[in-house]
């Protein structure tokens, strides 16, 4: 074997395979593996491109990489980042691929090409050079180094901010509806800050996700007798019955004016109770509402009204009726 491959101190790599870390650490294994092209033993380098990435290693020897001007790991062109076949077809390069039958013939061909590294492999046209220049990848895609087996979602991104940014090995997307119920430990969401299901991070994510993807509108209370909606933080200019009535009629077009039975204004607290004729009308309006909405240029808050407390006299009458 030639001394070129045996005494190699650094591999021939593209920037994507090398990774963004300037203080990378590599392991060197002389004659550790056979080249996948010429079958000769060569020095294998192994390293980790960055935190959360897969370990990479060289797959072909330096001679084959220099002959084809490719990366020893991804086998893509060092200048354009394209496969060898695409590059050669675009540039019109007709290079001898060498023998493919015998391992000895492959090794002999590699030794011969090693002595001719300084010679040109072929000629290329200006049109071909312009074509591969346009097809070249302008930006380094470090996402290729992310773990293939990790399909988990990032919980920090679901909360609204992930400090790791593009270097995060987990998916930056919100879960679908079938991933939300329960948020069990076996769900497809990664929680990097705490492993327990009762941790604050998991509870925060569950609260945010369920609040953002829950059913639209205000959930109706269990008490079927409640037919009113409560509005607070009303602006003074809209603290009038016609303004509030028109707000609900515009919000829910199926509603009619007679469907709103009455509106009780509490001017001292800038709030109001909107009483509907039936429970169905109240639920129709509630489905179009959100806990926080805007009326004019100010934010208002909406919620269902509460049940009336049962008076003591009514309680006594009910008890007497039960005794009788």
UniProtKB/Swiss-Prot annotation:
Q: Where is this region: Disordered?
A: 173-206
- What residue intervals correspond to the zinc fingers (C3H1-type)? 149-175
Compositional bias per record (Low complexity), positions renumbered to this chain: 185-201
**Residue span, RRM domain:** 227-317
Compartment(s) = Nucleus
State the Gene Ontology BP annotations: mRNA processing; RNA splicing
GO molecular function per UniProt: pre-mRNA binding; U6 snRNA binding; zinc ion binding
Q: Which UniProt keywords apply?
A: Metal-binding, mRNA processing, mRNA splicing, Nucleus, RNA-binding, Spliceosome, Zinc, Zinc-finger
Q: Write down the superkingdom of origin.
A: Eukaryota
Q: One GO cellular component term, please give it.
A: U2-type catalytic step 1 spliceosome
Q: Main localization of the protein?
A: nucleus
Q: Which Gene3D superfamilies match?
A: 3.30.70.330, Zinc finger, CCCH-type (4.10.1000.10)
Q: Which family does it belong to?
A: Belongs to the SLT11 family.
What PANTHER family has UniProt attached to this entry?
Answer: PRE-MRNA-SPLICING FACTOR RBM22 (PTHR14089:SF6)
The subunit field of the Swiss-Prot or TrEMBL record says: Associated with the spliceosome.
Q: Per its database record, what is this protein's job?
A: Involved in pre-mRNA splicing. Facilitates the cooperative formation of U2/U6 helix II in association with stem II in the spliceosome. Binds to RNA.
**What's the protein here called?**
Pre-mRNA-splicing factor SLT11
Recall the taxonomic lineage recorded for the source organism: Eukaryota, Fungi, Dikarya, Basidiomycota, Ustilaginomycotina
